[in-house]
UniProtKB/Swiss-Prot annotation:
Membrane-spanning residues: 354-370
Membrane topology: Single-pass membrane protein
Main location: membrane
Comp. bias (Polar residues): 281-290
Name of the featured protein: Cell number regulator 13
Gene symbol of the encoding locus: CNR13
Species name: Zea mays (Maize)
């Protein structure tokens, strides 16, 4: 029995147990009508299942369950329909930004779902039990009804804007346009907060499944939402409390004037030019509001303590990294050492250190010391003997494991990930 990319958790499938295929198809049709994303794909999927439901309604399903040759295929068909319902329902309940970012993956799941349901339908010996031309014609029509699932052009443009942002594109405008359609009854800041909560849930699910690709996408989306959040609180507060606007403004104005008067070295405004100090303060505030990529994963590092998430012998899961480390170990080692020592280390410096320790036959001692510092930084259990044996038996595997662990935990140094500042504009 196939599973569709982490869809269909056992707890959710158990809630649908007891429903026959016809009732499950009805649930899918209702869920498709309320989908927030992939609406066209949900409608096509539901329309295809309507054809199957119309056929099953004419059969005595209770009678078919009495025979083992038809009972098992029916149960497999119902399991596939349950996962199909969870797929359609996820387009309503899961994070809108996550579904948008994983657009083509969801499209692939729709294609796989329809193919699996059709395959199980062919296993049911309907033609031998209900032998008439009308049923055969409808079966042939179902087989010919091969829907084409695709990603909507508008959603694709939004996905490109969020995942591959143009430095001159304001993410606030993009998010306001998309979230206003997804949350029509919520103000923008509430919708953004709700999306952040859902993204945190998606992040935990991806981390538990060790899905590095999804973790990076979700971390990027969280960085975008936090960057946008930092630009709207003052405006949203003024909209929600207009009666306090005058008093707050006068108080802030008085405090600002007082601080300007108390500073003897602060230059006065002359000839319509604002003082340089005020510009520096504004630029400092703008820079401090930016959220570095991967910040959330680093802040939640405590949840990963006391164990390695990357297997020592699992280096082949990243062939490119494995080959790069095999032929150029200094490059991977320098990145690991930069994080373990909290200071940047170039590949040349790492190569010099390794060659120097190799002259006294203690290269493994040096690299295992860096591994120990990395364990202490990431709060991973272990001992010096384990570190030494890991680098002695297979130094390449140990380096790949350490860098994969850094990627899983998002424990990049601040200089490893750089996010360009958002475009700024003046309000008149």
């Amino acid at each position: 029995m196939a599973s569709w990319d982490n869809l269909g958790e056992l707890s959710n499938i158990a809630q649908l147990t007891g429903l026959d295929a016809v009732k499950l198809i009805s649930l899918i049709v209702r869920a498709a009508s309320t989908a927030r994303l992939h609406k066209r794909n949900c409608r096509r999927f539901a329309q295809h299942l309507k054809l199957i439901g119309g056929l099953l309604e004419q059969l005595r399903v209770s009678e078919l369950r009495k025979y083992p040759e038809t009972r098992e295929p029916l149960e497999q068909l119902e399991d596939a329909l349950r996962r199909g319902y969870l797929l359609v329902n996820s387009c309503q309940d899961r994070s809108y930004l996550y579904l948008l970012a994983m657009g083509w993956n969801i499209v692939y799941q729709f294609r796989k779902a329809q193919s699996e349901i059709d395959n199980y339908l062919r296993l049911v010996p309907l033609i031998t039990l209900v032998d008439n031309a009308r049923i055969r014609d409808r079966l042939e029509y179902i087989e010919r009804d091969q829907c084409e699932y695709s990603f909507d052009e508008e959603d694709k443009k939004v996905q490109d804007a969020l995942l591959n942002p143009d430095p001159c594109t304001n993410p606030t405008i993009v998010l306001k346009k998309t979230l206003s359609c997804s949350y029509p009854n919520l103000p923008f800041n509430e919708a953004l907060r709700k999306e952040s909560e859902k993204l945190q849930v998606e992040l935990q699910r991806s981390q538990s499944n060790m899905d590095l690709g999804s973790c990076e996408v979700i971390q990027h989306l969280l960085g975008v939402t936090k960057t946008v959040e930092s630009t709207i609180p003052e405006k949203e507060t003024n909209v929600k409390a207009p009666e306090k606007k005058g008093s707050n403004y006068s108080e802030s104005k008085g405090e600002t004037a007082k601080s300007f008067d108390d500073d003897d070295d602060y230059p006065k405004k002359q000839n319509g030019d604002y003082p340089k100090k005020q510009k520096d303060t504004c630029s400092t505030q703008r820079c401090s509001s930016q959220v570095p990529y991967g910040h959330d994963l680093v802040s939640s590092r405590g949840s990963y303590s006391d164990e390695w998430h990357a297997d020592l012998l699992g280096c082949c899961s990243k062939p490119a990294l494995c080959l790069k480390t095999l032929f150029f170990p200094c490059g991977t080692f320098s990145r690991i050492a930069s994080i373990a020592k909290d200071r940047p280390m170039s590949s040349g410096e790492a190569c010099n250190d390794i060659m120097a320790y190799s002259l006294i036959l203690s290269c493994c001692c040096y690299t295992c010391c860096v591994r120990r510092k990395l364990r202490q930084k990431l709060d991973i259990a272990g001992g010096c003997c384990d570190d030494f044996l890991s680098h002695l038996l297979c130094c390449c595997c140990a380096l790949v494991q350490e860098w994969r662990e850094v990627e899983i935990r998002g424990a990049y140094s601040e200089k490893t990930k750089v996010t360009p500042p958002a475009c700024q504009y003046m309000e008149h």
